[in-house]
A protein has these predicted regions:
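Conserved P-loop
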Residues: 1-71, 111-122, 132-135, 154-156, ...
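Short recognition patches in nucleic-acid-associated and regulatory proteins
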Residues: 136-162
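Conserved ATPase-coupling elements of RecA-like P-loop NTPase cores
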Residues: 81-92, 112-117
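Alpha-helical scaffold elements within enzyme catalytic domains, especially in hydrolases
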Residues: 25, 94-95
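Sensor-1/coupling segment of RecA-like P-loop NTPase cores
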Residues: 96-118
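Walker B catalytic acidic pair
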Residues: 79-81, 107-108
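Short basic (Lys/Arg) and small-residue
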Residues: 127
Length: 192
């Protein structure tokens, strides 16, 4: 029986690398996988999903799914699922329930203010299985929050969606997110 999976985690938890490795595992077993991302997410270029570790794969846009013939696909994997609309998540449910194709969606649970993204909210509501992809804060505790860093400080105001990658965000535990404590990062990228 096909299921809808939502695998969420803070930034830098290797969600994208995990998604690409799951694709690899399916393909190693001669299974056909469709990789998907919202068109809004374009930092790696159109139709490319790329992890911070350097893994990459081609993809289609979520906005195209409803017009595609999914016959023959064994799995659909969605990256950056927090950016999906309610209608797009409903279509993922259709793929699972009516077409019998498992869907594995990866994304952030909440934004830098601690509020749900729309796509994540609906995935949390409708997924058959919800799994956390873990990473750690600078202090060594589990990071569950995404801090937006502006001028070396944790931002508390601003638009929900500002695409920028690890130069603008740091994963923190809730205690350090609430305190605005970036520890050794001081607003630098994960690579510094």
């Amino acid at each position: 029986m096909a299921k809808l999976y939502f695998r969420y985690g803070a930034m830098g938890s290797s969600k994208t690398a995990n998604a690409i490795m799951v694709q690899y595992n399916y393909r190693e077993r001669n299974q056909k996988v469709l990789m998907v991302k919202p068109q809004l997410e374009d930092r790696d270029g159109a139709r490319i999903i790329r992890s911070r570790s350097g893994l990459e794969t081609e993809c289609v846009f979520a906005e195209e799914l409803e017009t595609m013939d999914l016959t023959g696909y064994d799995c659909v994997i969605v990256d950056e699922a927090q950016f999906l609309t309610k209608a797009q998540v409903e279509y993922l449910v259709h793929i699972v329930d009516d077409l019998g194709i498992p869907v594995i969606a990866y994304g952030l649970r909440a934004d830098f203010k601690g509020n749900f993204f729309k796509g994540s909210m609906w995935l949390m509501a409708w997924a058959d299985t919800i799994e956390e992809v873990k990473t750690i804060c600078w202090c060594g505790k589990k990071a569950i929050c995404n801090a937006r860093v502006v001028d070396g400080k944790v931002a508390r105001e601003g638009e929900q969606i500002v695409l920028g990658g690890d130069e603008q965000y740091v994963s923190l535990c809730r205690k350090h997110w609430r305190a605005g404590d970036l520890g050794k990062f001081k607003g630098l990228s994960f690579h510094d």
